[in-house]
């Protein structure tokens, strides 16, 4: 019976761990008086359903939980291809707003997160995200 060198086994395990587990994605931007953070557990996104979340915080860092959060995610038109454009409402879960994005193809996508609070001006944050 052949023995597999320990070093080779360690390299194979390291490669499987590094490439088998997708890293998350988190990007924070400021829109008006709000800090809006888009989070993805699995990044890059995959073709099909993806779960994302949005955290909205005011200038003092307190979570905003009384807003209506809508998300537009889209791929701009390219030569020979029409644009793809989708809209969804995020649902409050704890102190974050969650939504599902069904991405039909790989490539560069854009997301616009719009936050509307009672008695306050609307705020929109823009993000670039990739799908593979």
Q: Model-found features: residue ranges?
A:
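Contiguous segments within soluble domain cores/interaction surfaces
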Residues: 21-132
